[in-house]
Amino acid sequence: MECYYIVISSTHLSNGHFRNIKGVFRGPLSKNGNKTLDYAEKENTIAKALEDLKANFYCELCDKQYYKHQEFDNHINSYDHAHKQRLKELKQREFARNVASKSRKDERKQEKALQRLHKLAELRKETVCAPGSGPMFKSTTVTVRENCNEISQRVVVDSVNNQQDFKYTLIHSEENTKDATTVAEDPESANNYTAKNNQVGDQAQGIHRHKIGFSFAFPKKASVKLESSAAAFSEYSDDASVGKGFSRKSRFVPSACHLQQSSPTDVLLSSEEKTNSFHPPEAMCRDKETVQTQEIKEVSSEKDALLLPSFCKFQLQLSSDADNCQNSVPLADQIPLESVVINEDIPVSGNSFELLGNKSTVLDMSNDCISVQATTEENVKHNEASTTEVENKNGPETLAPSNTEEVNITIHKKTNFCKRQCEPFVPVLNKHRSTVLQWPSEMLVYTTTKPSISYSCNPLCFDFKSTKVNNNLDKNKPDLKDLCSQQKQEDICMGPLSDYKDVSTEGLTDYEIGSSKNKCSQVTPLLADDILSSSCDSGKNENTGQRYKNISCKIRETEKYNFTKSQIKQDTLDEKYNKIRLKETHEYWFHKSRRKKKRKKLCQHHHMEKTKESETRCKMEAENSYTENAGKYLLEPISEKQYLAAEQLLDSHQLLDKRPKSESISLSDNEEMCKTWNTEYNTYDTISSKNHCKKNTILLNGQSNATMIHSGKHNLTYSRTYCCWKTKMSSCSQDHRSLVLQNDMKHMSQNQAVKRGYNSVMNESERFYRKRRQHSHSYSSDESLNRQNHLPEEFLRPPSTSVAPCKPKKKRRRKRGRFHPGFETLELKENTDYPVKDNSSLNPLDRLISEDKKEKMKPQEVAKIERNSEQTNQLRNKLSFHPNNLLPSETNGETEHLEMETTSGELSDVSNDPTTSVCVASAPTKEAIDNTLLEHKERSENINLNEKQIPFQVPNIERNFRQSQPKSYLCHYELAEALPQGKMNETPTEWLRYNSGILNTQPPLPFKEAHVSGHTFVTAEQILAPLALPEQALLIPLENHDKFKNVPCEVYQHILQPNMLANKVKFTFPPAALPPPSTPLQPLPLQQSLCSTSVTTIHHTVLQQHAAAAAAAAAAAAAGTFKVLQPHQQFLSQIPALTRTSLPQLSVGPVGPRLCPGNQPTFVAPPQMPIIPASVLHPSHLAFPSLPHALFPSLLSPHPTVIPLQPLF
């Protein structure tokens, strides 16, 4: 190779040639070593080299030819060449990416296409569609081990088919769940029926666990729970060797469903009634003997039908006609909802899901809720209706006890039962009678033939929409008929599950009778369901209670529906005794309502002036007259109170006995009391008082008079409380009513107290007398008590109090609102001490026991009631002895009456309740009485009837508190004494109630109320008379000072100035009289400036809301507005803003902040502000239901104008 030396020198020529090569080796000169090369050879070499250069120095990328190595290298290293190279690479990469993406897309498309093809292939492979998988239905299949955990509790033997022995395992698993999804998952909970031939059945009876397909079909446009429409059908793996095992559609709607066949021990529990049944029935049908697949399928179809219509809860006797209806297994108990439409007649056409759909999903809910008892009752009714022939004569009778008893009733399929079912699916046997299909009910054609059902069209090709519309139209008519028949029934619960839907369930006539009390059969079923859920297997009483509870819930759901008494009367045959009681109760109610109407008329005459105060009241009165009549004869609990009405219905039946007594007592007393409180009592029973209840009825929007009647009849404290409250509310101004109504649903009792407060303010003087009567009567019954609280307060208000009727209403409303929780509880307890157990009276069973109120009542309470009535006069005399009587007659004598009544009531309570009697004895201290007298005088002078009303209201408030007030409360002598031991333990709300009156030191007008209740209510006078509050007491600000804005200046003038109150009003707290407070509250000096400003507001609030004082106190405590006063310290001058922590925490919920807004100055204790001993508050938290803000429009909201406080004394 030639070696070139690059020599840069002058020897280089411009053309690159060397001039002279000197000393430079340029390679071999010649081959032969000759320094001189041939020219020709040399030229050849050069040419060749040039060609090589051209070939070697050509840039393809740039398409450039270089002849010299150096130039070529320079080009390759140039930016131009590099840039082109990058561009080329980028293009290449982009191209590669594009190609790859396209390839991937293509691959994906191919995969999708393959998937589609596979899907199509799979779909094509699926030759069989699950029944009900048509356009309306979507189905899924779940496999469940059939015999898993098979427990055969009851055996249903088909007497007709002796060959076949069905062993149904009923697994009663307590489930409130209404979802049947778990049923499919849980073979135990699911009703699994394994039908096996004799050959294989006995051997593999507990061994083989065949998979059963559960088809859960839901109408696409129906809001249905899984269990309601789920249809469980069995897939038979071995037709020859093994009887086709099928599982009844398993739903967790366990109900007391009994497969009624020839053997009385055979009972099939259907899980239809999830909520009601404590256990989902798992029934396994095995064919111990050679069992025809058809029969097994019939049973399964029946079971399925039962399961499917669990929503409907219709106890239809399913005649699964494996043997041409010979083996009709009435699963009515099991399947209250539906009957299996097997080629036999389908007795449960009324159970059809469509019917449910027409009624509402509520129906479904109620059906699920229906308990075994309800289903049993329905079955009994069904039998009674003779719509189904019962092969077992004892079947219908045993059905009622079927909850506990295993009743086998074989019902012959009947044509009348062969009505179109309303269920979305009907278990039917295929033409070969080998498979039980869940066939869409729309597609079923009922015939008079033995199979009675024909289905041929492919569900996928079936036009469900058109048929469903027609069916709904047809079904609605039967529903009306059923409703009519149901309405004839006494108990709402009688047919909780019965045919609410259509007459087509004549086979379900029993159910119709039971469940279709009202057109809202849904509501009835709901009631029944709830009841059933409460006691699926419990006795009839339990069922009744549950039904009432359920009725309340159902009533809520079916507010749009009105219950008539006949509807309510409808009760399941299972609850025949209840029905009888209900009938008696209803009869009693009718008589009672008549008497009440008369009394109401009298009271209305008395109250017309007051009721005329507001047009709304008059309107309410007019409506109430209608509502009252309707309510008396028709249970029309509308909306909010319907749930209460349900409970009240239970209570009404239970408490009717005790209530009639109280009514009679109240009648006699009413005559004495101008029948005012009695009217109110009766009205309260029916719907508070007509004047108020009518308004209240309207206001309550379906807290119908019937519901009120129910509550009253039931002697339900709550219902009464609601009624009274509604009455008060109606009597109150519409604004207050609206507030109360807003709170009505949430705090029926609280609002009730408020309403009472208003009414009492309106009619305080009248109520004074009535209330005295009422006190004696209230001992008889909660009703009387509540009514006393109700009207007497209105009456208690002196005629002069009518000057500020609205304010008193507000006051009472506030007081009641405050004390309402306590009042509710108190009323329950005070309900002639049934209340104490009438707290339990909330329980329907307790309500039933309410007849035995006195028995339930502690002996002290019973004595207390009697004593209250007797001691009312005695205590009046005592009051004359007590300084309370010193209250000048300036109070229009009503105050004296109130004092007398209050004292008597208090003393009665004291005597009744020895634990509190000590406090009561010490309660009427001379100083307190003097203060009370002064206060009373000033009230009379100022005609501060509102204040008087407040004291009157205070007893009601005290009553309210008594329910929640614990024994240990230092509170009211009457309260403590009157409260039974149980009552004494109640929350300090009672204290608040009592103390509100004490703190205000208003004339003890509330004595009337206290006397009226005669139970645990301490009259303001007695409270004030001793004024012996514990050394640590809480001042409770009244709730609605806004209401006081409307109060005339007169009222404010009556409010003590801080100095006057502090100087002249000193409470002596006798230590012996009152138990020492659990936690001493430090006295906080109250700024007089604050006193002047907030005292006005608070004072009016207190005056207007003694009844609501408890609720307000709780709210205030929650808001931290309570103030602690040393008993000996001047109230207003020394009351500082109480630290919120110092006061016991009252769970007032959102009300507290509204009552006591932060911007408000610390409330000053007005003369009438209740004083709550710390011991009372601390021992137990005051549990106030969350009071609606409307009820308490910010207790301490700053007053736009502060009326100068004038010395009260």
From Swiss-Prot:
> What GO cellular component is one of the record's annotations?
plasma membrane
Q: Name one GO biological process term.
A: positive regulation of neuron projection development
Extent of Basic and acidic residues compositional bias: 380-394, 826-836, 848-860
Q: Could you tell me where the Basic residues compositional bias lies?
A: 807-819
SUPFAM superfamilies attached here? beta-beta-alpha zinc fingers (SSF57667)
Provide the alphabetized UniProt keywords: Metal-binding, Zinc, Zinc-finger
Region Disordered, residue ranges: 380-401, 792-860
Which residues form the C2H2-type zinc fingers?
57-81
Q: Name one GO molecular function term.
A: zinc ion binding
What protein name does the entry list?
Zinc finger protein 804A
Question: Which classification does the entry list for the species?
Answer: Eukaryota, Metazoa, Chordata, Craniata, Vertebrata
Q: Which gene encodes it?
A: ZNF804A
